[in-house]
């Protein structure tokens, strides 16, 4: 199956945009999921508050 140059260009640009979105969107997505779920309780039952500051400075 032969593809026209315009179709090849479109597919290439789509792959580039998808790659960019996945590379730059993965970490924020994981952080979002962490904030949405919340922290898991420690073995003694204490739940530590989850905030941006606790992510940066433990």
UniProtKB/Swiss-Prot annotation:
Keyword Cell membrane in record: no
Position of the signal peptide: none
Side of membrane Mitochondrial intermembrane, spans: 36-58
InterPro entries linked: Tom7
Keyword Transmembrane in annotation: yes
Family stated for the protein in its record: Belongs to the Tom7 family.
Name assigned to this protein: Mitochondrial import receptor subunit TOM7 homolog
